[in-house]
Regions:
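Extreme N-terminal basic, low-complexity initiation segments
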Residues: 2-4
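Alpha/propeptide regions of enzymes that mature by internal proteolysis
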Residues: 6-218
């Protein structure tokens, strides 16, 4: 069973092929992973369809946690338009993502997803191989206005049942190896460390303090 991590930077956009999904939404094929899983772009969403059973570890509010029965994972740009605010389709973020999954044509109970204000056409896809192991990262991000550093003063409070702010750095990490859940969690930590290292190499500053950013405020 192949492992996949979905969490909340380095490559070029890969042009693909276009066809029409059964919902009538035009989709573009972006990439086929070493596992046989395929990534598509559906207008403002990127969906990775699993070819077989997958161990999925996700930090998403929508169907997050550890699961072994998911069929896909998606990343969605929530902006109404370029430079415009993000759209909420329901009173809660969880229900908002459930509606999005249905719109794309997915089964909400069998997927997990992430929201962002980053443009899907700017996705970065990178695969690295060592011997029999291949790791693929599918990343969207942008922290010009929301870069933050661990330890910065909090500037946002979300009471229960209020919409969440949408995230700004989203990573889908696919590992073509069968790992126990604890090792998969360790890989997620290493992925987070790599994200922070990439941000600091860019010398991106926090918008809430004088230090370098370690991630986004969301």
């Amino acid at each position: 069973m192949t492992d996949m991590i979905g969490i909340k930077n380095i490559s070029v956009f890969l042009p693909g092929q276009e066809d029409t999904f059964f919902t009538g939404v035009v989709r573009m094929k972006l990439y086929t992973v070493s596992t046989g899983d395929t990534a598509y772009r559906y207008e403002k969403s990127i969906v990775v369809f699993f070819k077989g059973a997958r161990k999925v570890l996700s930090t998403s509010v929508f169907n997050g946690g550890y699961h072994e029965n998911y069929k896909a994972v998606f990343n969605h740009d929530g902006k109404v338009g370029s430079g415009m605010p993000c759209e909420m389709l329901a009173d809660t973020y969880t229900e908002h993502m459930r509606i999005l999954a249905k719109r794309i044509g997915l089964e909400p109970e069998l997927v997990t997803g992430m929201g962002t204000a980053a443009d899907m056409e700017n996705v970065a896809i990178e695969s690295l191989t060592y011997k029999e192991l291949t790791v693929t990262a599918i990343v969207t991000g942008g922290i010009e206005t929301n870069g933050g550093r661990v330890g910065d003063p909090a500037d946002y409070y979300k009471p229960a049942e209020k919409p969440d702010k949408l995230g700004t750095i989203n990573i889908i990490l696919i590992l073509d190896a069968d790992m126990p859940p604890g090792t998969l969690a360790r890989a997620l930590v290493t992925c987070t460390e790599a994200k922070t290292a990439a941000i600091q190499e860019l010398l991106a500053g926090s918008n809430y303090s004088t230090g370098l950013a370690t991630g986004s405020g969301t």
